[in-house]
């Protein structure tokens, strides 16, 4: 997959992102429901002098799951150890991490849905009983010993909650879904980030940038840095709505936040397959992209904003999609199955 300026996935260019992350819940913009619940749970745990219950954060990439995990640790006044599902390949890897935790520490596992079943089996007693089962020896003489662990908080993050096994999901006491951000929330985030990065941005520039950021703070911050470059070279260093529009045109990002890959997907459905329904595997083969990438990275935005309908027979382009691309929508009932 080629690198996209508006990809919600992390890129090497996002090294600046950590400096933009808030450190307290009161500074965290958006996600009011999740934030309000976490505030109650954190305050209650601190009053009792206990570790916070295990937390599962899920939703599309780039919405602030990692940021919230770090905020939880800061609010609890404890350390955080971060890793990801693909990195923990063997039970011994997880055991090494767990045995080095201090009481009430936060263990953050990104992409937790990618943990192997063998590693998950080790995690169950660790989450529920704060014990680690270690097998000594092999064969008939093998025996299991239980090692006590400090009470810790596991914060898991995933973009695909449906792939979590039921036993793992059931062990999380707090489950929060993160939603796409509103334009107003993103405008506030852009203004805050511009202040931290010492970038001059006008209110209309922040609003225009937010409108094209696909409801995702990571994309908004990345576009802010790209537009800053344009403003410094071709403008007076101040980001206005006009500067945003001109710079994003150069990046081939339209007024809806679509880039070339979004247009390729939508026009493939509309022009090649008559608007659908068309299967995801067929779309992937037609555009030369992986099925999972389309489903995880591209589709959430297109579905959320009403450009694609997901049906039992396949993906279907909506009336809004036809209007956006200047196409005439077919009469109801038309379309072929691929």
Curated annotation (Swiss-Prot):
Binding-site positions, Mg(2+): 66
GO biological process terms held by the UniProt record: DNA recombination; DNA repair
Binding site for DNA: 291, 310, 315
Residue ranges, annotated region (Small ATPAse domain (RuvB-S)): 182-252
Catalytic activity, reaction form: ATP + H2O = ADP + phosphate + H(+)
Pfam family, one: AAA_lid_4
Keyword DNA damage: yes
GO cellular component, one term: Holliday junction resolvase complex
HAMAP family: DNA_HJ_migration_RuvB
Family: Belongs to the RuvB family.
NCBIfam families, A to Z: PRK00080.1, ruvB
Subunit architecture: Homohexamer. Forms an RuvA(8)-RuvB(12)-Holliday junction (HJ) complex. HJ DNA is sandwiched between 2 RuvA tetramers; dsDNA enters through RuvA and exits via RuvB. An RuvB hexamer assembles on each DNA strand where it exits the tetramer. Each RuvB hexamer is contacted by two RuvA subunits (via domain III) on 2 adjacent RuvB subunits; this complex drives branch migration. In the full resolvosome a probable DNA-RuvA(4)-RuvB(12)-RuvC(2) complex forms which resolves the HJ.
Protein name per its UniProtKB record: Holliday junction branch migration complex subunit RuvB
